[in-house]
């Protein structure tokens, strides 16, 4: 099955899964946890339909974006190749995020059902899964970024990286590596660190990867601009 078809299927799967799962949940379930895994909000089980609806909308939007990104009326073969490359990257992003949120939704439903019947409910498992998922997602997206070509839709996009094709190539190669490293460290944190720290570690590492990549993009921009003097 081609990536784009699987990605489309994946955007609808969370909705079907949730509709089935909700039949087995009590009417009132945990719907929110703080960063320590403690339940701080209860509500209707139908609240869990929000994420699948958002995923459906995002899936349709991203699918249309990928389709438009891969087609052009130009006869320039190089530009067409760049557009097709970016379309594949977008499809990969849709696939990766779809897998992440599908897994997250499944765990949220499982934890909600378990905690609704537990005398000492906890969201510790959910925190680890979120951190682990974010780490794996970062690794996957980090591998995709260097495959993108200069555009305004996907990749490490800022004014400095958009300066030239070379600035884009170098910035996205470095940014991809930074994401991979932060993702691997996040996975380790999700496995080894206390639950209360797992998501914080993921957020801190992602922020550091972004800051370092921005600094590198600025450096590359200056180097590229200096060549024109």
Residue ranges and their predicted role:
Residues 1-229:
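Feature 926 captures the class I aminoacyl-tRNA synthetase adenylation module centered on the KMSKS loop
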């Amino acid at each position: 099955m081609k990536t784009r078809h699987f990605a489309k299927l994946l955007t609808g799967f969370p909705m079907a899964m949730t509709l089935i799962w909700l039949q087995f949940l009590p009417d009132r379930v945990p719907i929110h946890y703080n960063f320590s895994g403690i339940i701080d909000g209860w509500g209707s089980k139908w609240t869990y339909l929000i994420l699948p609806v958002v995923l459906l909308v995002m899936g349709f939007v991203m699918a249309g974006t990928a389709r438009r990104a891969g087609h052009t009326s130009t006869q320039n073969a190089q530009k067409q190749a760049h557009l097709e490359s970016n379309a594949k990257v977008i499809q990969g992003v849709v696939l990766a995020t779809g897998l992440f949120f599908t897994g997250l939704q499944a765990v949220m439903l499982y934890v909600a059902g378990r905690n609704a019947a537990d005398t000492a409910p906890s969201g510790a498992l959910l925190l680890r899964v979120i951190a682990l998922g974010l780490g794996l997602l970062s690794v996957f997206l980090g591998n995709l970024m260097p495959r993108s070509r200069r555009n305004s839709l996907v990749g490490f996009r800022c004014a400095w990286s958009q300066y030239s094709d070379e600035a884009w190539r170098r910035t996205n190669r470095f940014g991809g590596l930074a994401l991979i490293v932060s993702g691997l460290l996040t996975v380790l944190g999700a496995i080894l660190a206390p639950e209360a720290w797992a998501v914080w570690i993921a957020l801190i590492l992602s922020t550091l990867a972004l800051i370092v990549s921005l600094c590198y993009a600025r450096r590359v921009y200056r180097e590229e601009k200096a060549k024109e003097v």
